Amino acid sequence: MNQEEINKFKQNFEFLENEIGKVMVGLSDTIRLTLATIFAGGHTLLEGAPGLGKTLLVRSIAECMGLSFKRIQFTSDLMPSDVTGTQVLSEDENNKRTFKFQPGPIFANIVLADEVNRAGPKTQSSLLEAMEEKQVTVLGHTHKLPQPFFVLATQNPIELEGTYPLPEAQLDRFLVKLLVAPPSASELNEILNRTTGQEQAKIKAFANKEESTKAILQMRKLVKEVIVAPAVQDVLVSMVFSLDPNSNTCTSLVNQYVKFGPGPRGAQAVMMISKVLALLDGRANIAYEDIKTAIIPALRHRMILNFQAEADGVTADKIISEVKDAS
């Protein structure tokens, strides 16, 4: 890795940020971390109330990257086969009946799983194999998904009616969980100015599909080449152990409110996001600040809190922040 490659990575990333920023107002951190997750090779979970621009963000990313895009609207009656696809009976040119695989909407480079917590657990689980293995199995036959492949899921807060909490196994498949906050008064004014007039902002495509695919795979390769000093890695390991209630180094807050802490996959997620952040700062090595920026979005959904935490209004973000500030 040389400085020219780092600068090219930063230039491409900032182009995407700026183009998406033309249609998104006040979500700069969310845009950056969502893109960082894509280049880290992971999947993103966006949580927020309806109407905050979660779906628009995912559509804008797909449009800007020039990749194939499919949207799955999760509902209570959605079946697993509606996601992965199914075998259908068809006739060939010799009028012979055969079963043919009809791919579901999961077969795209970028898949928007909209309101994923509106569907039941069985349908939610149909995403698991696709997200982890980059393939789906239908009636005993395995089908590879197109590359690159990213799932960007949106969900409503659990307090809203008609929602099913995502199981821990599925939550762990998401590299980061981002909370989409409501806009401020000035941001809402800007949203109204941009969306209710005659002229609408247009996004430029990063490249055509073939060039974009090649660039993304190259950028992902560069991310893995970022260096991690042993001392920096030790800090990350120490922070993860401090969030485990079974560890001797856990804090009093963790001991009181945490049922299960993050596992190895959580530490991997922090590391991968930190590597992207290092490149965006023009560095070929991770700094402590990269880890401190990445740790909350990468671990907040991997913390399982007890009932006492809910009763006392203690969140995973608060617990992770305490450990982060003490490190």
What are these regions (language model features)?
Residues 35-76:
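Walker A/P-loop
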Residues 33-36, 90-112:
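Conserved alpha-helical scaffold flanking the Walker A/P-loop in AAA+ ATPase domains
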Residues 49, 83, 154:
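P-loop (Walker A) phosphate-binding loop of NTP-binding proteins
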Residues 5-9, 23, 172, 177-253, ...:
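Conserved C-terminal "switch" segment of AAA+ ATPases
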Residues 48, 114-115, 126:
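Walker B catalytic acidic pair
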Residues 7-52:
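Pre-Walker A (pre-P-loop) alpha-helix and adjacent loop at the N terminus of AAA/AAA+ ATPase modules
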Residues 90-94, 119, 123, 131-225, ...:
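Canonical AAA+ ATPase core
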Residues 2, 245-327:
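C-terminal engagement/docking regions of AAA+ P-loop ATPases
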